[in-house]
Amino acid sequence: MEEITMALNIENIIAEIKEASILELNDLVKAIEEEFGVTAAAPVAAAAAGGAEEAAKDSFDVELTSAGDKKVGVIKAVREITGLGLKEAKGLVDGAPANVKEGVAAAEAEEIKAKLEEAGATITLK
């Protein structure tokens, strides 16, 4: 009998939360934080720590996201950067998104990104 009462109470609480406005929910969160000495910002801090970890990364993959309008120039740049033949470079550009280079140092990755973007490509460093 006690479990049924608790389930009904939980259902009532959920129904009230669904009907509450954003301001009321904000006040509820603040009240819960004060009452129980917790903070709702903890997951945000964990995400920020992950971002700092990524900033310290020392090797990157240079991904060609899109060749853009200047496909021929991008193919030439890919050939110059990778040493691939014309057919292979064209295949890589046509197959975008694709990694142009993997595991390169941050400075080299930025250079490659600049060359490819100058040629008209869209690049992502991962």
Curated annotation (Swiss-Prot):
InterPro entries: Ribosomal_bL12, Ribosomal_bL12_C, Ribosomal_bL12_C/ClpS-like, Ribosomal_bL12_oligo, Ribosomal_bL12_oligo_N_sf. This is Large ribosomal subunit protein bL12. Keywords: Ribonucleoprotein, Ribosomal protein. One of its GO terms (cellular component) is cytosolic large ribosomal subunit. Coiled coil: none annotated. Homodimer. Part of the ribosomal stalk of the 50S ribosomal subunit. Forms a multimeric L10(L12)X complex, where L10 forms an elongated spine to which 2 to 4 L12 dimers bind in a sequential fashion. Binds GTP-bound translation factors. Belongs to the bacterial ribosomal protein bL12 family. It comes from the Bacteria. The keyword Ribosomal protein applies. The gene is rplL. Pfam families: Ribosomal_L12, Ribosomal_L12_N. Forms part of the ribosomal stalk which helps the ribosome interact with GTP-bound translation factors. Is thus essential for accurate translation. Gene3D superfamilies: 3.30.1390.10, Single helix bin (1.20.5.710). One of its GO terms (biological process) is translation. One of its GO terms (molecular function) is structural constituent of ribosome.
